[in-house]
């Protein structure tokens, strides 16, 4: 597991490159929603890199400085890598209105979490609005959410598709975020974070 935790971010970058290559290859034949799907996967990869490495330190804000609970390297890897893999499966098998609603919901959630909730927490605790993940949330996920919404409105999905999209969005969020922490969160977890990243100079 230690080996995988040391390389999974780079594996994610490789997956992002594959997604972009598929986008270029199929640009002319794909409709707007299918084109947005690989961009959403790529945005997630960039988002994870911002949270973990550039500048990193998302865990420090999320955990209140605790290096391994409730979020550890293991739980957050499972959360993010599963999302990247699921998104890539959607790209490979063809995005549609239902999967696009899921991606719209996730994009909107990232904007809300980093742009509002964690921004407030970071301001309250450290006196800064920025939190790791905020830049990609606002510069990548926010435009994607708007584009998904615009093209979904143009596509006019049926009520059944909208409801299924909402249900699947809840399921994906539960499976990728809630379950890993429910089953893998451990105050004694050896998979701890060590670098406060952005908060290195702000931490007491």
Predicted regions and their residues:
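Terminal transmembrane helical module of multi-pass membrane proteins
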Residues: 142-204
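Membrane-proximal helix-loop-helix units in multi-pass membrane proteins
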Residues: 82-144
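Central hydrophobic cores of alpha-helical transmembrane segments
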Residues: 39-42, 102-109, 159-171
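Membrane-interface helix-boundary motifs at transmembrane edges
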Residues: 23-36, 92-99, 151-164
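Juxtamembrane "helix-exit" motif on the non-cytosolic side of transmembrane helices
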Residues: 24-26, 93-94, 115-126, 151-154, ...
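Early transmembrane hairpin module of multi-pass membrane proteins
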Residues: 28-82
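Hydrophobic transmembrane alpha-helical segments in integral membrane proteins
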Residues: 1-15
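Aromatic-anchored segments of alpha-helical transmembrane domains
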Residues: 44-49, 107-119, 169-179
């Amino acid at each position: 597991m230690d080996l995988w935790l040391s390389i999974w971010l780079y594996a994610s970058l490789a997956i992002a490159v594959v997604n972009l290559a598929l986008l270029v290859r199929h640009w002319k034949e794909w409709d707007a929603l299918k084109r947005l799907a690989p961009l959403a996967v790529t945005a997630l990869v960039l988002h994870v890199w911002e949270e973990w490495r550039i500048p990193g330190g998302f865990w420090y804000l999320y955990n209140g400085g605790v290096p391994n609970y409730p979020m550890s390297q293991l739980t957050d890897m499972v959360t993010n890598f599963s999302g990247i893999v699921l998104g890539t499966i959607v790209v490979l098998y063809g995005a549609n209105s239902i999967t696009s609603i899921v991606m719209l919901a996730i994009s909107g959630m990232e904007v809300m979490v980093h742009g509002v909730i964690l921004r407030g927490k970071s301001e309250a605790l450290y006196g800064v609005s920025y939190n790791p993940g905020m830049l990609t949330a606002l510069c990548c996920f926010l435009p994607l959410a708007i584009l998904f919404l615009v093209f979904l409105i143009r596509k006019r999905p049926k009520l059944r598709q909208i409801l299924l999209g909402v249900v699947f969005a809840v399921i994906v969020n539960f499976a990728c975020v809630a379950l890993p922490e429910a089953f893998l969160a451990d105050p004694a977890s050896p998979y701890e974070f060590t670098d406060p990243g952005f908060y290195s100079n702000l931490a007491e």
